[in-house]
Amino acid sequence: MKTIKLLILAFVAFTPFTGCAPEDDIKNSNLSPYLFYEEFLSVKEETEGDPLDILGWTNFAQAGTVKWNQGFYSGTKYAEFTSYQSNEPSNIAWLISPPINMDLLENEKLAFDVAQAYVSSSSNSIELLYSTNYDGTNVTAATWIPLTFTKPPLDYDTNFDFFSSGKIDLSDKDIFTGNINLAFRCKGSGTNFSLDGTYEIDNIRIFNEK
C-alpha cells in the first residue's frame, strides 16, 4: 500500500468523524435476519497484509501472485486487493464466497461496503460476479456472470473511505436458485503506476427485504 496512506490516516485520526457507516444506508425495519454475512472477523492486526484464508472461501490469483489480503485499520477488518509494488505486469485476483443457498429466502438483496485508493483507470477494476456451477476448485472453468453495483468515487479526497454498493436484486428465482457463489475479481498491475491502486470490501450481506 502506498506510503502516503500513512499521512492521510494520520490526518484522519485528528479529524472529527461525522459520517455514518455505509452499512447503515440499507438498514430499516423491513429487513429480516441475514441469509449470508461476512465481515472478516478472522482478520488479525498482526497478520494485516497476509493473504486471506477464511474457511469456505476461495482466494485465487489468476494472473501474477497477488491475492486478496487481510486488511486492518483502527479496529476495522476487511479484505484488500492492491497491485502496488507487486512488480508484476498483470495481477488478477478472485475472492469467492462459499455456496449460498438461495432457496431459503424470498426477495433477496445483496449489499456490501467498498473502498478504493489511488485508482485512476477503468482497467484497474473491481467486479462482482456470481456462478451457479462453480465446483469449489476450478475458478476459470465455471461460468461467471457480472452483477452491477455502485462503485466508490475515484476521488483523492475519498481514498480508503467505504461506500455502500447499493442494494443488488437477487430475487429472481428463474436465475438465483439453489446454490450460488459470489466472486469479487480485481485487476491491476505492479509495473504500471496508473494500474496499481487498492480496493477494499467489507460487510458482505444477503438479506430478505419484506
Question: Can you name each region flagged by the protein language model?
Answer:
Residues 114-151:
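Extracellular ligand-binding interfaces
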Residues 40, 97, 102-118, 126-130, ...:
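Extracellular beta-strand-rich recognition modules
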Residues 88-105, 109, 163-168, 200-201:
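Short beta-strands within extracellular/lumenal beta-sheet-rich domains
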Residues 1-7:
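Bacterial N-terminal signal peptides that target proteins for export
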Residues 80-93, 155-162:
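Extracellular beta-rich ligand/substrate-recognition surface
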